[in-house]
Amino acid sequence: MSYLPNGAIVLPAGEGRPIPGDGLLIPNLVGKVTADQGSGSIAAMEGTAEPGFGPPIHIHHSSEELFYVLQGQMDFQIGDQRVSATPGTLVMVPRGTAHAPRVVGRERARFLVMFAPAGPDGLFYEIAALAQENGGAINDNDSRIEALTAKYDTEHVGPPLQ
Protein backbone atom coordinates (compact mmCIF):
# COMPACT_ATOMS: atom_id res chain seq x y z
CA MET A 1 0.00 0.00 0.00
CA SER A 2 1.23 3.46 -0.83
CA TYR A 3 0.23 6.61 1.00
CA LEU A 4 0.76 9.69 -1.15
CA PRO A 5 1.57 13.09 0.39
CA ASN A 6 -1.93 14.43 -0.37
CA GLY A 7 -3.60 11.63 1.63
CA ALA A 8 -4.35 9.41 -1.35
CA ILE A 9 -4.01 5.65 -0.91
CA VAL A 10 -2.88 3.33 -3.70
CA LEU A 11 -3.41 -0.38 -3.09
CA PRO A 12 -2.19 -2.80 -5.78
CA ALA A 13 -4.23 -5.84 -6.78
CA GLY A 14 -3.97 -8.70 -4.30
CA GLU A 15 -3.15 -6.48 -1.33
CA GLY A 16 -5.26 -5.58 1.69
CA ARG A 17 -6.12 -6.79 5.17
CA PRO A 18 -7.78 -10.25 4.99
CA ILE A 19 -10.90 -10.97 7.01
CA PRO A 20 -11.62 -14.72 7.03
CA GLY A 21 -15.30 -15.48 6.61
CA ASP A 22 -17.17 -17.52 9.18
CA GLY A 23 -19.69 -18.98 6.72
CA LEU A 24 -22.60 -17.56 8.70
CA LEU A 25 -22.40 -13.81 9.27
CA ILE A 26 -19.51 -12.66 7.12
CA PRO A 27 -18.10 -13.67 3.73
CA ASN A 28 -14.39 -13.85 2.97
CA LEU A 29 -13.31 -10.22 2.77
CA VAL A 30 -10.17 -8.23 2.11
CA GLY A 31 -10.13 -4.75 3.60
CA LYS A 32 -8.88 -2.34 0.95
CA VAL A 33 -9.42 0.91 2.88
CA THR A 34 -10.46 0.66 6.53
CA ALA A 35 -11.82 3.10 9.10
CA ASP A 36 -8.36 3.60 10.59
CA GLN A 37 -6.84 4.66 7.25
CA GLY A 38 -7.36 7.97 5.53
CA SER A 39 -9.98 10.32 6.92
CA GLY A 40 -12.44 7.61 8.02
CA SER A 41 -15.00 8.90 5.55
CA ILE A 42 -15.12 5.62 3.60
CA ALA A 43 -14.22 1.95 3.97
CA ALA A 44 -13.91 -0.46 1.05
CA MET A 45 -13.64 -4.25 1.04
CA GLU A 46 -13.55 -6.92 -1.65
CA GLY A 47 -15.59 -10.01 -0.86
CA THR A 48 -16.22 -13.53 -2.11
CA ALA A 49 -19.03 -15.78 -0.99
CA GLU A 50 -20.44 -19.15 -2.00
CA PRO A 51 -24.01 -19.72 -3.23
CA GLY A 52 -26.47 -19.63 -0.36
CA PHE A 53 -24.41 -17.27 1.77
CA GLY A 54 -26.25 -14.33 3.28
CA PRO A 55 -26.23 -12.58 6.65
CA PRO A 56 -29.37 -11.79 8.66
CA ILE A 57 -31.45 -8.77 7.64
CA HIS A 58 -29.81 -5.83 9.36
CA ILE A 59 -29.64 -2.05 9.62
CA HIS A 60 -26.58 0.20 9.70
CA HIS A 61 -27.87 3.24 11.57
CA SER A 62 -24.91 5.54 10.88
CA SER A 63 -23.55 4.55 7.44
CA GLU A 64 -24.62 4.05 3.87
CA GLU A 65 -23.58 0.68 2.42
CA LEU A 66 -22.75 0.22 -1.24
CA PHE A 67 -22.34 -3.10 -3.08
CA TYR A 68 -20.88 -3.53 -6.56
CA VAL A 69 -21.21 -7.04 -8.01
CA LEU A 70 -18.14 -8.20 -9.94
CA GLN A 71 -19.02 -11.88 -10.48
CA GLY A 72 -21.96 -14.17 -9.81
CA GLN A 73 -25.48 -13.18 -8.85
CA MET A 74 -26.78 -11.72 -5.62
CA ASP A 75 -30.27 -10.95 -4.40
CA PHE A 76 -30.83 -8.03 -2.04
CA GLN A 77 -33.69 -7.30 0.29
CA ILE A 78 -33.82 -3.52 0.73
CA GLY A 79 -36.69 -2.42 2.92
CA ASP A 80 -39.69 -4.30 1.54
CA GLN A 81 -38.23 -4.67 -1.98
CA ARG A 82 -36.20 -7.56 -3.36
CA VAL A 83 -33.83 -6.96 -6.26
CA SER A 84 -31.45 -9.14 -8.24
CA ALA A 85 -27.91 -8.00 -9.04
CA THR A 86 -25.57 -9.40 -11.70
CA PRO A 87 -22.02 -8.27 -12.60
CA GLY A 88 -21.86 -4.53 -13.09
CA THR A 89 -24.83 -3.83 -10.81
CA LEU A 90 -24.44 -1.28 -8.03
CA VAL A 91 -26.72 -1.37 -4.98
CA MET A 92 -26.65 1.55 -2.53
CA VAL A 93 -28.45 1.09 0.79
CA PRO A 94 -29.23 4.31 2.71
CA ARG A 95 -28.39 4.40 6.41
CA GLY A 96 -31.25 3.26 8.59
CA THR A 97 -32.64 0.86 5.95
CA ALA A 98 -33.18 -2.83 6.71
CA HIS A 99 -31.35 -4.93 4.13
CA ALA A 100 -29.56 -8.20 3.41
CA PRO A 101 -27.67 -9.71 0.47
CA ARG A 102 -27.74 -13.37 -0.55
CA VAL A 103 -25.61 -15.18 -3.13
CA VAL A 104 -27.90 -17.03 -5.56
CA GLY A 105 -27.29 -19.32 -8.51
CA ARG A 106 -24.45 -21.80 -8.80
CA GLU A 107 -21.48 -19.48 -9.01
CA ARG A 108 -19.42 -17.91 -6.25
CA ALA A 109 -20.01 -14.17 -6.00
CA ARG A 110 -17.26 -11.58 -5.96
CA PHE A 111 -18.16 -8.04 -4.99
CA LEU A 112 -17.03 -4.76 -3.53
CA VAL A 113 -18.70 -3.44 -0.40
CA MET A 114 -18.20 0.10 0.89
CA PHE A 115 -19.38 2.06 3.91
CA ALA A 116 -19.68 5.84 4.11
CA PRO A 117 -18.68 6.92 6.61
CA ALA A 118 -16.35 4.11 7.58
CA GLY A 119 -17.06 2.30 10.81
CA PRO A 120 -19.16 -0.83 10.27
CA ASP A 121 -16.13 -2.42 8.60
CA GLY A 122 -14.69 -2.87 12.11
CA LEU A 123 -17.58 -5.20 12.90
CA PHE A 124 -16.30 -7.70 10.32
CA TYR A 125 -12.82 -7.77 11.86
CA GLU A 126 -14.23 -8.31 15.35
CA ILE A 127 -16.65 -11.06 14.29
CA ALA A 128 -13.81 -12.79 12.41
CA ALA A 129 -11.65 -12.65 15.57
CA LEU A 130 -14.52 -14.07 17.62
CA ALA A 131 -15.02 -16.88 15.10
CA GLN A 132 -11.30 -17.65 15.20
CA GLU A 133 -11.49 -17.96 19.00
CA ASN A 134 -14.26 -20.52 18.46
CA GLY A 135 -12.33 -22.66 15.98
CA GLY A 136 -13.45 -20.76 12.87
CA ALA A 137 -17.20 -20.89 13.47
CA ILE A 138 -19.69 -18.70 15.23
CA ASN A 139 -23.17 -19.22 16.59
CA ASP A 140 -25.53 -16.44 15.54
CA ASN A 141 -27.24 -16.76 18.94
CA ASP A 142 -23.98 -15.83 20.71
CA SER A 143 -24.74 -12.82 22.94
CA ARG A 144 -21.36 -11.33 22.00
CA ILE A 145 -22.64 -10.83 18.43
CA GLU A 146 -25.43 -8.56 19.65
CA ALA A 147 -22.94 -6.54 21.70
CA LEU A 148 -20.59 -6.18 18.72
CA THR A 149 -23.33 -5.13 16.32
CA ALA A 150 -24.51 -2.51 18.81
CA LYS A 151 -20.94 -1.23 19.17
CA TYR A 152 -20.92 -0.55 15.40
CA ASP A 153 -24.43 0.97 15.36
CA THR A 154 -25.77 -2.06 13.49
CA GLU A 155 -28.85 -4.06 14.37
CA HIS A 156 -30.01 -7.51 13.21
CA VAL A 157 -33.75 -7.27 12.53
CA GLY A 158 -34.60 -10.49 10.68
CA PRO A 159 -33.36 -13.85 9.43
CA PRO A 160 -31.18 -14.37 6.35
CA LEU A 161 -32.94 -14.35 2.98
CA GLN A 162 -34.11 -17.67 1.61
Q: Regions from the language model: what does each represent?
A:
Residues E107-A150:
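A contiguous, mid-protein "functional segment" used to position or interact
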Residues D36, F53, H61, Q73-M74, ...:
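Hydrophobic small-molecule pocket/channel-lining residues, especially in calycin-type beta-barrels
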Residues V30-G31, M45-H60:
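Conserved short histidine dyad/triad with adjacent acidic residue
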Residues M1-I42, G135-Q162:
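A short, N-terminal "cap"/entry segment at the start of jelly-roll beta-barrel domains
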Residues S62-M74, G79:
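Glycine- and acidic-residue-biased ligand/ion/polar-headgroup-sensing regions
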Residues G38, D75, R95-D121:
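Ligand-binding loop in jelly-roll beta-barrel domains
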Residues P12, Q73, D80-A98:
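Short acidic-glycine-tyrosine-enriched beta hairpin
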Residues S41, E65-Y68, L123-E126:
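Residue-level recognition of specific faces of alpha-helices
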